[in-house]
């Protein structure tokens, strides 16, 4: 089992050094989990800007930074659409050094994050807001990404034997 260890040292009121120990052959999912753990540990801190020195990371862990940042981003999700008082701002991570994620990786991670957050938003909406008609309306907007979308009416759903779905959507 992968053991993650994050230790921080406060050097002044404005500066903290954070050390993260890594295993030699860190998998992508473990790097994401490490990012999530980092976010959990520091999300309530007064510090919102962090720097990651990628030169201290072995080049055979090529995708570590991208996966680490991806884990932070996924963990930072908050559904605050109906909150009157929003939580404080997101943390900012600046990567310095040679081992930074390339543009293709950043684009891939960004696309995954947008899709994940869109799905989480749909799941978090209350039923009186996201009823079947509203859900169909929102899903139709995804056709601009090349998705083929077919919206079934009640008659078609009955014909397909989806009675439970019809019952839930009443």
What residue ranges belong to the model's regions?
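Short amphipathic alpha-helical segment within the helicase RecA-like ATPase core
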Residues: 1-170
């Amino acid at each position: 089992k992968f053991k993650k260890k994050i230790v921080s040292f406060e050097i002044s009121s404005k500066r903290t050094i954070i050390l993260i120990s890594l295993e030699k052959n860190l998998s992508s999912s473990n790097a994401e989990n490490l990012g999530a753990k980092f976010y959990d540990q520091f999300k309530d801190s007064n510090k919102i800007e962090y720097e990651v020195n990628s030169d201290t990371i072995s080049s055979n862990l090529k995708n570590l930074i991208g996966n680490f940042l991806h884990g932070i981003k996924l963990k930072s999700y908050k559904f605050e659409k109906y909150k009157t008082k929003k939580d404080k701002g997101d943390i900012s991570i600046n990567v310095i050094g040679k081992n930074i994620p390339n543009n293709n990786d950043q684009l891939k991670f960004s696309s995954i994050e947008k899709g994940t957050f869109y799905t989480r938003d749909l799941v978090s909406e209350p039923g009186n807001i996201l009823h079947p008609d509203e859900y169909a309306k929102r899903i139709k907007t995804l056709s601009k990404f090349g998705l083929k979308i077919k919206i079934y009416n009640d008659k078609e759903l009955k014909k397909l034997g989806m009675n439970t779905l019809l019952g839930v959507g009443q």
